[in-house]
A protein has these predicted regions:
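Catalytic core of PPM/PP2C metal-dependent serine/threonine phosphatase domains
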Residues: 69-99, 118-141, 150, 199-270, ...
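Active-site-proximal, acidic helix/loop segment immediately C-terminal to a metal-coordinating Asp/Glu
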Residues: 193-215, 281, 287, 304-351, ...
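Short hydrophobic/glycine-rich mini-motifs in sensory/regulatory modules
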Residues: 24-28, 98-101, 152-155, 180-185, ...
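Short strand-connecting beta-turns/loops that link adjacent beta-strands
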Residues: 180-182, 250-252, 364
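Conserved beta-strand-loop-short alpha-helix elements that form
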Residues: 182-194, 257-261, 296-319
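N-terminal entry segment of metal-dependent catalytic domains or homologous docking segments
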Residues: 126, 139-192, 197, 203-207, ...
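PP2C/PPM family metal-dependent serine/threonine protein phosphatase catalytic domain
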Residues: 149-173, 227-233, 263-297, 341-347
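Soluble C-terminal extramembrane regulatory/interaction domains of multi-pass membrane proteins
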Residues: 1-126, 130
């Protein structure tokens, strides 16, 4: 009422009702403005998602068009070998768009083959390429055997974690897996805050990103779609999350680090140690449609070690202690992860959730 001119207050017979009506209209106008802004942002994010999905479909079409086709000679050798074991089977041998060999054997009598000692080595000799079981097909029915060309590189992974003091659960979540393309994917997410809500946010982030990556979506595109999903759902119960994604091609050693708001990562190759920083904000913070994550590419050679950690472990730019740990030349990645976590705890306490993931690349034995 005091904001109104005196002459108006003196002449208005229903001043309280007038003030209430004006305030209600101002609130409604503010809500409408907020809604318009939200709709505009959502349209922008949705448009970015459509562009990303178009990119996904385009890549799928390119992959289908670049299939190298079946290998009939290898198929005939494989069928002859199976018949020599009295196994009547359907077999297919082909190379995908990336040149990786795929072998599928279907039969109701695979048990004699699987009971053979070193059956993978024998099948590898038949088709002329070293084979391994498909992780995606593990646990399938015993009437179907899916094999893939084995990668020349192998990895060992170590994980150590500690929840914030006084909390029942950690808000950090992570996972690692190998795709059928022979790419190791390591995901680490840190939900904002601590406790159950942060744990739920980070778990959802990891689950969504894993589904995209296992489906063959390009990692950079998968990260952008994840960011869009969090932007669209930030008005519900979801918060924000920092995201680390490391992808290692186990055929070539080509490695990409993708980051949204994440703490620095470290890579030791030979005698050099590289610090990989992040400039972007956490996933789910509105910063424009289609904003890509920070991306760093490099090649990891056998003997290289990477350390990925949440911000409870790496505080500010104080990292000389971590570099000293890396220079000690740990061969056991679990021991390196535990040592890193222990040193961080002694320096900074447990004022935040703390998670360390260590990765070492080696030649396959």
């Amino acid at each position: 009422v005091s904001d109104l001119p005196g002459f108006f207050r003196d002449r208005c017979d229903k001043l309280p009702a007038f003030v209430s009506a004006v305030n209600a209209e101002l609130r409604a106008q503010a809500y409408r403005k907020q809604l318009r802004i939200g709709l505009t942002e959502n349209r922008s994010v949705a448009w970015g998602q459509y562009m990303d999905m178009a990119d996904v479909l385009s890549r799928v079409a390119d992959e289908l068009g670049s299939l190298n086709g079946s290998d009939p000679l290898a198929e005939r050798r494989l069928i002859r070998y199976l018949r020599s074991m009295d196994i009547d089977a359907d077999a297919s041998v082909y190379r995908d768009g990336g040149g990786r060999l795929h072998v599928t054997i279907e039969s109701g009598r695979l048990t004699p083959l699987l009971r053979e000692e070193n059956y993978l080595e024998k099948l590898s000799a038949v088709v002329g390429a070293r084979l391994c079981r498909s992780a995606a097909a593990a646990g399938e029915e015993c009437s179907k055997l899916v094999l893939l060309e084995a990668e020349p590189l192998a990895v060992s992974v170590g994980i150590a974690a500690m929840k914030k003091k006084g909390e029942k659960v950690s808000g950090d979540k992570g996972t690692y897996f190998k795709t059928d393309a022979g790419v190791l994917c390591v995901i680490l997410a840190d939900g904002t805050g601590c406790g159950d809500e942060a744990a739920q946010d980070s778990a959802q982030v990891v689950a969504i990103l894993e589904k995209f990556l296992r489906s063959g979506v390009d990692p950079a595109v998968a990260m952008k779609i994840l960011n869009s999903v969090l932007l669209l759902r930030s008005g519900d119960s979801w918060g924000y999350a920092t995201v680390d994604l490391m992808c290692v091609d186990l055929f070539t050693g080509e490695t990409c680090f993708y980051k949204y708001g994440a703490a620095p990562s470290y890579v030791k190759s030979g005698k050099s140690i590289r610090r990989i920083k992040c400039e972007t904000l956490a996933a789910g913070i509105s910063m424009g449609a289609g904003i890509a994550p920070d991306t760093v590419r490099m090649r990891l050679r056998p003997g290289s070690t990477a350390v990925i950690a949440t911000d409870g472990v790496i505080v500010d730019a104080e990292d000389e202690w971590l570099k000293q740990l890396l220079n000690k030349g740990f061969d056991d990645m679990k021991a390196l992860a535990r040592a890193t976590l222990k040193e961080a705890e002694s320096r900074y306490g447990v004022n935040d959730d703390m998670t360390v993931v260590t990765v070492r690349v080696e030649e396959r034995a």
